[in-house]
Amino acid sequence: NKKYSYKYISEKIKYIQSKIKKNSVILVVASNNVESIIGYMSFIRSKNISVLLDKSFKVEYVNKIIKKYKPNYIFSPEGYFNWQTKFQKIISGKDYILVRTHYKRYKNINGKNLLLLSTSGTTQNPKFVRLSNLNLTTNTKSIIEYLNIDSKQITITTMPMAYSYGLSIINSHLHAGSKIIVNNNS
């Protein structure tokens, strides 16, 4: 039942951005809550690559992704992993933690890639769709135009933000300055 202003969210985004290095890969274990949205927006706006996974994925599956993609940072619910102590804690929020891993930063990150969205979470076979800043921006603006979304509208999150449809609702309504009711129940 809390309300957050765009100013508050913007300040939190800038704070998180100040804590991460450029050319990083960030694994985001997301849930439909304000901290997940702020973390996601921080990483997208800083032009780092985010690997977005849903909190409902089994930890063993997420560990496979970590071994495969070797993220420089992990943003996850506090206590989601039992090994967080072996990484350097950067930020600890109300329910979320940002840790720096021991993996080396990639030297040749494709600046066009911005987001990796899982396509096969239910099969436990890690496959991702790569989205660029242009993909996200074009898609967001297209949805806003087609659905006539503006700052007067209110939406509710009913799909997980780690799914393309759920994320498009968040992206389009944030971009339009709309109100979003963040709901973790589908």
What are these regions (language model features)?
Residues 137-154, 162-186:
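Conserved AMP-binding/adenylation subdomain of ANL enzymes
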Residues 70-74:
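Proline-aspartate-enriched helix->loop->beta-strand connector
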Residues 1-20, 60-63, 131-134:
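Conserved AMP-binding/adenylate-forming core of the ANL superfamily
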Residues 12, 30, 51-66, 178-186:
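ATP-dependent adenylate-forming carboxylate-activation enzymes
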